[in-house]
From Swiss-Prot:
Glycosylated position list: 47
Protein name: Suppressor of tumorigenicity 7 protein
Naturally occurring in which organism (per UniProt): Cavia porcellus
Coiled-coil features, chain-numbered ranges: none
UniProtKB keywords: Glycoprotein, Membrane, Phosphoprotein, Transmembrane, Transmembrane helix
Family named by the database record: Belongs to the ST7 family.
Cellular localization per UniProt: Membrane
Keyword Transmembrane helix set for record: yes
Gene, per the UniProt record: ST7
TM regions (residue ranges): 15-35, 62-82, 511-531
Residues where Phosphoserine is found: 385
Primary residence: membrane
Cross-referenced InterPro entries: ST7 (IPR007311)
Topology of the protein relative to the lipid bilayer: Multi-pass membrane protein
Amino acid sequence: MAEAATGFLEQLKSCIVWSWTYLWTVWFFIVLFLVYILRVPLKINDNLSTVSMFLNTLTPKFYVALTGTSSLISGLILIFEWWYFRKYGTSFIEQVSVSHLRPLLGGVDNNSNNSNSSNGDSDSNRQSVSECKVWRNPLNLFRGAEYNRYTWVTGREPLTYYDMNLSAQDHQTFFTCDSDHLRPADAIMQKAWRERNPQARISAAHEALEINEIRSRVEVPLIASSTIWEIKLLPKCATAYILLAEEEATTIAEAEKLFKQALKAGDGCYRRSQQLQHHGSQYEAQHRRDTNVLVYIKRRLAMCARRLGRTREAVKMMRDLMKEFPLLSMFNIHENLLEALLELQAYADVQAVLAKYDDISLPKSATICYTAALLKARAVSDKFSPEAASRRGLSTAEMNAVEAIHRAVEFNPHVPKYLLEMKSLILPPEHILKRGDSEAIAYAFFHLAHWKRVEGALNLLHCTWEGTFRMIPYPLEKGHLFYPYPICTETADRELLPSFHEVSVYPKKELPFFILFTAGLCSFTAMLALLTHQFPELMGVFAKAMIDIFCSAEFRDWNCKSIVMRVEDELEIPPASQSQHFQN
């Protein structure tokens, strides 16, 4: 009984839905009936005659003005559409049509779609969020010794405010803790990391170091008749040395000296906090801060050694650091190690590092993907020839190299243009967006020399990298080896990269058809209005001639013959059969 009642209710509901779907036809006939009934009270016939009389009295100048006004409005719409497309990457009218008009006109219900596809899209949404995350550049330069020198020479600012603000947030996260207010020097540095003015930050760092040089006297009564004053030094402030090395030092050698002083102070603080970390949450947070400071100092010292040409020393320091702190993956020290090993041409060691970090469970980067492609290209690039490959086909090793290049290009399609020097390089930012133009600049800035060193590697890349796009015709919707390409990269890269750099956009955005159609229609109507206003008689003769041509019998016969000939060409009918066909 219950099942019968449920079935009846479902049928009743479907009938109501069906009736509402076609109810507009009933309303249409009702309106027509009301107009017919009320034609006399509303004086519809008189109004129609008045309108026809008004239209008959209009002059050609009115139509010219009307055409010009419509052209002006179309031009304004075109300008607005073009501005909206340049700013947001989509057509305003198309977006309104899809988002608002389509549901009103019987489009697909968004709720049902979301409920059906929520499970399938959850992973891709999480991946999209993670790929749109901004990461700290593991190969970032030194502000004082490198970025500021570029500004002095060119007068351009290589870093954006957004990028420097992210660095300030990183410094506050890595180098501060809740107990800093208990130590005067750390309290000063906590404020220094928030300063926007570089000179104010440097002055605060010097002030923090001066406070640590004040000696505290502790009175110790050793003999009853005398008093001995013991002089005790406060511990040095490691973060102050870090700030001075990053921003005040004008050369890498000066920065290295300051980092060595920071290492002495940071190592002492780390050992003391390591012994007290289990005494409470406050000591644990302080030990975590001291660990971050020590790792940062050692990593920057290794980078100084790499800059100064002591590459083997830098490799040893990086390996020791990765062994001592294996869980601190936020600094991505393995990418610094890969670059240094490539400089030494230790390709076997590079392969060993890739075997550990090029794992499906670990986040990818341009350094990982393109270094793997470089190693596979190195095995075949010296003998690779496009002509020979087209004749005999690709060997197994060449196929592996091409697949590795396609994998790397799919992950970050902006890198090949910089490696092939199709776009000019700039100084890399302090933060990068994975799969974006900022990551491509950061990778190519340091790895272009390694690709040039391998004979034929750039030639192989030049011949094969564009083939990736045939495998992923719709990269924003579906990828091949990775998730679909995130659509947020362009906006984030414009915030990270300086204004004088032309941001690389992938995939290339084509103008929507509506904008092109509006532009053509606007231009055509404006031209007709101008010609009609200047030469009214000539345009009238031309319009009459065109109407006569289109309405003539010869034009209709020619159009029919052209259609028949086109159909016969598509069907490939032989000449004999064609003549027989026309005879029949």
